[in-house]
Amino acid sequence: MAIVGLGTDIAEIERVEKALARSGVAFAERILSAQEMETFVSLKQQGRFLAKRFAAKEAASKALGTGIAHGVSFQDFTIKNDDNGKPYLQLAGRAAELAHQMGVCHTHLSLSDERHYAVATVIFES
């Protein structure tokens, strides 16, 4: 196995919370997949959840080499958790196509947050 893509992103939680306060659920819907929205609406710390998802999707798009552009959107990425709570990345649409072209067989996602920031790192392996 070889690393074919690596991306990292950091998001300021307060900035995401302010955008959420200004734009409401429309901002969240722009970032989150339908599955993620189901979780989001039931949370008390929505800004923190959204900041982590934003950072993860930005990191994944950087690992693809495109960023959120060239037909790749936030909706192409869904962050899920396994039975132990470990986050993992599900790709769809243009992101899945590009990952396939890159020979991606395995994805790795690490998420962390502290008081002010959420950070994510994504590794794509062939």
UniProtKB/Swiss-Prot annotation:
UniProt keywords, alphabetically: Cytoplasm, Fatty acid biosynthesis, Fatty acid metabolism, Lipid biosynthesis, Lipid metabolism, Magnesium, Metal-binding, Transferase
EC numbers, comma separated: 2.7.8.7
Residues binding Mg(2+), per UniProt: D9, E58
GO biological process: one example: fatty acid biosynthetic process
Molecular function terms from GO: holo-[acyl-carrier-protein] synthase activity; magnesium ion binding
Pfam families xrefs: ACPS
Gene3D superfamilies in alphabetical order: 4'-phosphopantetheinyl transferase domain
Compartment(s) where it occurs, according to its Swiss-Prot or TrEMBL record: Cytoplasm
Gene Ontology cellular component annotations, sorted alphabetically: cytosol
Catalytic activity entry: apo-[ACP] + CoA = holo-[ACP] + adenosine 3',5'-bisphosphate + H(+)
Keyword Lipid metabolism: yes
Keyword Nucleus recorded: no
Principal subcellular localisation of the protein: cytoplasm
Cofactor: Mg(2+)
Task performed by this protein: Transfers the 4'-phosphopantetheine moiety from coenzyme A to a Ser of acyl-carrier-protein.
Family note: Belongs to the P-Pant transferase superfamily. AcpS family.
Protein name: Holo-[acyl-carrier-protein] synthase
